[in-house]
Amino acid sequence: LAKQDVVVVSINYRLNIFGFFMHPELSDQTGNFGLEDEMVALQWVKDHISFYGGDPENITYFGESAGGAHVSYLMASPKGRGLFKRGIIQSGAYNLFDWTSKNKSEELGTTAQTLLGVQNLQTMKNLPAETILSASASLGHPFGPNIDGELIPNNLTQLLEEGSFNNIDLIIGSNKNEDYMYIDENVTANDIDKLIERYYPEHKDT
């Protein structure tokens, strides 16, 4: 990339329960803290990339797997408008089906609080990070972006179908055989039913 006159910036964002946690006591927040981290990072790039030889009006946002899905979220977010000119989504499409409503995210946050045995959010926040992460592990690491009505205004697939997204250039691709890592020799019919219910709930009874 350096030989092609590209300035590459790698960013970090909060993950799992730390990046995508919602709770009734956080009603004034989106719960999509990881995506907010990414937006701050993109704004930093836009404000400072010229000092490194980059063009603030020619930013390409690239992500793979969950990162690819995050490119989609910000592409369809009103708050992401103007942060980047082009997007590259690599193996991120399956994540578009894995969305949660704000109410369900709040319920999940309350479940995590109960699992940790604390009375309120503030007490939960004072726990060691490892303890909080263990609660997420016990729940199967279910924390991800939620439809908060602000940063993510609606179901992403619906926004894309409606044409409600920012006008950017886009490349979409997939890694060959990427999902082989998830193949399990002991898959049961019940496992398949759970996958259908998670990603295609409208077809769970067919």
Language-model region placement:
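Serine-hydrolase-like catalytic core of hydrolytic proteins
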Residues: L1-L121, L159-I183
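Substrate-gating cap/lid region and adjacent catalytic-acid/histidine neighborhood
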Residues: T123, A129-T206
